[in-house]
Amino acid sequence: MPSPLNDPALEALLERLHKESNAQVDDTRAYFDRRVQEGTRARNTPYDDAAHRFLSDKMVALDRDKAQFCYLLCRALRARRVVEAGTSFGISTLYLAAAVRDNQVDNGVVIGTEYEPQKAAIARANFQAPA
């Protein structure tokens, strides 16, 4: 699917971030599969402390098509205020911010929340990246 963003600098940044995120998917899946096989975690159960520690430095990002859908949904709704729970490294937040920007509304705002301080710091750096 072609990108709806029409912003080459942002698209380049997101391309890099999506590649980094995709590189972690197999390791993350293997970690949870191994935990299930070991009997230390049942399928479809809430995350325990070990899982939280494992994920604390991982990108937990929407796939590109889902992030683009969120962008298009915010555009269609002419969203001016968006709250995201679980910003992680800020990939989906960049899509949400682009939608609010492209809606050309006064006083638009995107609020991202993140539990892990190091992820929040990386997200802030991604928001400041030239895009």
Tell where the protein language model's regions lie, with residue ranges.
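A short alpha-helical cap/connector motif
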Residues: 1-131
